[in-house]
Curated annotation (Swiss-Prot):
Belongs to the fibrillar collagen family. These protein fragments were extracted from an ancient phalanx bone collected at Arroyo Del Moro in Argentina. This is Collagen alpha-1(I) chain. Glycans are attached at residues 88, 881. It comes from Scelidotherium sp. (strain SLP-2019) (South American ground sloth).
Amino acid sequence: SVPGPMGPSGPRGLPGPPGPGPQGFQGPPGEPGEPGSGPMGPRGPPGPPGKNGDDGEAGKPGRPGERGPPGPQGARGLPGTAGLPGMKGHRGFSGLDGAKGDAGPAGPKGEPGSPGENGAPGQMGPRGLPGERGRPGASGPAGARGNDGATGAAGPPGPTGPAGPPGFPGAVGAKGEAGPQGARGSEGPQGVRGEPGPPGPAGAAGPAGNPGADGQPGAKGANGAPGIAGAPGFPGARGPSGPQGPSGPPGPKGNSGEPGAPGKGDTGAKGEPGPTGIQGPPGPAGEEGKRGARGEPGPTGLPGPPGERGGPGSRGFPGADGAGPKGPAGERGSPGPAGPKGSPGEAGRPGEAGLPGAKGLTGSPGSPGPDGKTGPPGPAGQDGRPGPPGPPGARGQAGVMGFPGPKGAAGEPGKAGERGVPGPPGAVGPAGKDGEAGAQGPPGPAGPAGERGEQGPAGPGFQGLPGPAGPPGEADLGAPGPSGARGERGFPGERGVQGPPGPAGPRGPGLQGMPGERGAAGLPGPKGDRGDAGPKGADGAPGKDGVRGLTGPIGPPGPAGAPGDKGESGPSGPAGPTGARGAPGDRGEPGPPGPAGFAGPPGADGQPGAKGEPGDAGAKGDAGPPGPAGPTGPPGPIGNVGAPGPKGARGSAGPPGATGFPGAAGRVGPPGPSGNAGPPGPPGPVGKEGGKGPRGETGPAGRPGEVGPPGPPGPGEKGSPGADGPAGAPGTPGPQGISGQRGVVGLPGQRGERGFPGLPGPSGEPGKGPPGPMGPPGLAGPPGEGREGSPGAEGSPGRDGSPGPKGDRGETGPSGPPGAPGAPGAPGPVGPAGKSGDRGETGPAGPAGPAGPAGARGPAGPQGPRGDKGETGEQGDRGIKGHRGFSGLQGPAGPPGSPGEQGPSGASGPAGPRGPPGSAGSPGKDGLNGLPGPIGPPGPRGRTGDAGPVGPPGPPGPPGPPGPP
């Protein structure tokens, strides 16, 4: 079956039933759940000091506890009795290299070594910086004035100066006579899709919600064993797409096809969902919801990252080994009073990784969290192809009478249909499956235009398919609608990526564990004291040829040297390569005004540029600084005065058009002959000292300087310590030491009496140090032995909570069956004739009527006399939106109108796309020389030039005086 044309948009439905009712009362407390496996709860308040219990039976040895922070260094103990000599221990591991000690005092200077071989000549260094600019020489004698040259041809016209400020708006002209209605122009091609606009600013945070009532605390679950490391988390949810770009201009209107026959096929299967549209701009931040009830404790988290390696603790003195027999362990005493809060110790080194424990029990699901904020509405998806109409469904139940919706746009009046004979009611068939979308039929030929029929009664039509998206309407903010029904609970989301470890919780009320095992070797000790000066070393062998040193940086410019004698001229060197163009210099002070030039002839008109496609509206650029005023161009030739035409009607201000591409540049005229140089202008005023320029880039490394003169004899100043040399080869192991004598075994000391427990000290002030790194998770303690508590009494119903935030919009429910046609309403009274309304929005394209015969073109009427200027009438009220009229026939072209008065300057339109680069302009006139710049700093002293070639022998000198006899 051929699908029919897309129907117009159906009327807006009545609003649905009101949302959910007020919040209900709090239900009775639930049954105690299974023990969870969540993290340890917060530390409770300290209990009253208990009494010392009797010694209990020997308990099982507990798990080794974590290594505690190093305690403070104790007082030095008394020397113990000499012990027996111990056995030779195993050789310990090599300790870490200690910190580099300070350099010792320099030993006596050794004998100078033999001179090394001369190194290879170094490469030529980079080109030096240009020297300072020389002082201006003395002015030469003025030359004789040359003959005046011939007058040069007029140069090309100068560039157009900047547009002047907008003039004052002129007086409102009289309303002109309405001209003949022009033919409707063809719609332009569809524009390219615009780029997404910049993201909007973040909305302000909403007010804080009222805190909710605390929920009933759950039963404390047993701590599970540390779980094994979980599998890598699923990838996170895809981030939101960028903001939706501006809609492009509407495309060309297509030909309407002939109405297809009603399809009677089976309903096809549901089509594939359309592509996801671009996400709209983020909406304003919603109000912060109230605090939800406390959820059930979650499963035990994965172990956090290992903490930073702590610094070395102070080494304590070894205590004497106890030799008493192990007594029976006492009964577990009641916990004593909480002691004073100790100062935080240094972070310990991370312990060895424990074995993976068994997987903990899965925690009970948490209570549903508060409703999330309403997300921004997504963009409208692409319209699907219309499927064949399905069979009519059963009659639905009467809905709740809703509020009257807004007045819909007036539809095209339909042709009165003939009333048919009512048939017998048919049996309601089963709902068919959704059929597959049929292929779009070819557009049919345009039929003849039909006559406009009378408006018929509203027919029992079904809701049409959604029409194409119309142009954006005016922003009339309607009243907020009622809160929608709370959506169904969504499916559980994918498991998120593991978040960063949270801050360390408060210290739990557990008992102190057993002392830990001895840790690994400590970090290297502190830097040692400076050693004594060593003996004088032997004279070293002559050193090898050193590696050529790196080119040193360019030194600071030296003082200006005295002018040297003029050297002999050497031979001319070859011409060097053309240097790169230097950076543009600072703008010089404006020179004296030159003589006025001759007015150039008007340039040839350029070819009109091709009409560019409307560009996308670009973001409004920042206002640039005002440019300098351009020179005023010569006045152009006065054009011929045109015949005055009749004054046209004042049109309404249209939207600013898109900036088109610039037209093709005109031909560049030939440059005129160079004129004679004018007389030098008077010297300008002394320029002001410019501001400090930005720091220049680091220049290339300079050439190595010449070898300086030898220094004075004797020992030089003490040099700075050299860099660390490479690590030497490991030394051979030293000789084995002699075993010491075995000492006498000391007598075991008496066991001291147990002291009384001290009173709890006052709580110390909280420390102000930075929080230490998070330590590794501790081993799970044994489960506590407690009786199951009896359920508490039923609480009284709580107060009604504050209304929660607006819930997310629920999913669109299935389309209900079409309602039965309503009874035809009584015709309303004839209303007064409405005023001429604004032009209505473009409605959906209706089926093309049969083309009517072309009417004969009427004769052109005589030109009427120009009417008097009428008085300006008062501005009328805004009219009611009228129906869109039919396109009129194209009238004859009117006589050319007189140029209208210049209207007020409109708002600057959005910046269009950047045009192609223009052609190179004609060379400008030679500018006047600016004032000489300030004398730069003296450059580095130049090196002596190479000696020139030996000159020819001079003529013989005159004979000398005779010698003495």
